């Protein structure tokens, strides 16, 4: 399972909101880039960021802060908040962000997501599905649409989306545990990578997400409140995450001349994924 430690940016500061309410703000740092470096040092392989001001205003606000976060670390960064046009996407990618998260526009204009995928590639486009009581919220969670989270997720899959960040707004910033059931439904019904967001409060919550077969989890307040030790979580849930580097590939200890061929001149083999142990 991939872990995504989160940095929410408001007025250039690292903050957390309760249930997405902009009048319920806790400031954790005036230097978000230092938080990012700490996450990388703890072993994080990916960092999640949100421009909260941008989400509310509909355009990027904290560009310089996001740029400094990206330049301070060597791991990829994903970012959401205020991305409404193809030009916005290009601007954010130019900041050093690896992939962008699009929420409101996915609801209002699904064709925009297809155009974004066609132009930038599916690996750089993530859709944010943020729900209140099962219905998708937009514009910084200030408005609720008539679309269900599942219907939007399925529609996004049909146009080529490979990754969705699912947030249960009622859980966000509350340290009350994630909505595992609904997140698993999205994962099972769509078959694409679902990243759970909202409510992570302890290692047990991460275990439940992992056991449900969900691709990833975003952790925010639980790290800042020292309820989850990021380094310990990375060691437990991402034990094979860094093995993608060539230097970590296992080396064969047998030469070809030692192998026995069958009657057809072929070598019978069992192929196993060296990261997760799955027999392919």
Regions found by a protein language model. Give the residues of each.
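Structural preference for beta-strand elements that scaffold enzyme active sites
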Residues: 2-6, 46, 74-78, 98-101, ...
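Conserved, mostly hydrophobic/aromatic
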Residues: 8, 39, 47, 79, ...
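Glycine-rich, proline-tolerant flexible connector loops at the mouths of alpha/beta enzymes
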Residues: 46-64, 104, 109, 165-176
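Charged helix-capping and loop-helix junction motifs
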Residues: 60-67, 142-151, 176-185
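Catalytic cores of alpha/beta
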Residues: 73-99, 181-219
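C-terminal helical cap(s) of enzyme catalytic domains, especially alpha/beta-barrels
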Residues: 113-119, 187, 206-244
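Flexible "arm" and connector segments at domain edges
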Residues: 239-280
């Amino acid at each position: 399972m991939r872990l995504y430690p989160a940095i929410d940016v408001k007025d250039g500061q690292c903050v957390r909101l309760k249930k997405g309410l902009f009048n319920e703000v806790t400031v954790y740092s005036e230097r978000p880039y230092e938080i990012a470096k700490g996450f990388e040092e703890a072993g994080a392989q990916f960092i999640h960021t949100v421009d909260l001001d941008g989400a509310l205003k509909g355009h990027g606000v904290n560009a310089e802060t996001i740029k400094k976060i990206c330049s301070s670390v060597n791991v990829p960064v994903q970012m959401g908040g205020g991305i409404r046009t193809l030009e916005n996407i290009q601007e954010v990618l130019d900041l050093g962000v690896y992939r962008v998260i699009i929420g409101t526009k996915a609801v209002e204009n699904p064709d925009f997501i297809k155009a974004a995928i066609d132009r930038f590639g599916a690996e750089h486009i993530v859709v944010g599905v943020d729900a209140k009581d099962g219905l998708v919220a937009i514009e910084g969670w200030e408005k609720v649409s008539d679309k269900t989270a599942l219907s939007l997720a399925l529609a996004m899959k049909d146009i080529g989306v490979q990754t969705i960040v699912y947030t249960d707004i009622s859980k966000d910033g509350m340290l009350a545990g994630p909505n595992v059931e609904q997140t698993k439904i999205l994962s099972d019904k769509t078959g694409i990578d679902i990243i759970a967001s909202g409510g992570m409060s302890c290692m047990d919550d991460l275990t439940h997400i992992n056991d449900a077969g969900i691709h990833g989890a975003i952790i925010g307040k639980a790290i800042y409140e020292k309820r989850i030790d990021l380094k310990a979580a990375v060691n437990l849930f991402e034990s094979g995450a860094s093995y993608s580097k060539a230097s970590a590939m296992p080396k064969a200890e047998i030469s070809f001349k030692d192998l026995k061929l069958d009657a057809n001149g072929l070598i019978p083999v069992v192929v196993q994924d060296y990261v997760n142990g799955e027999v392919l």
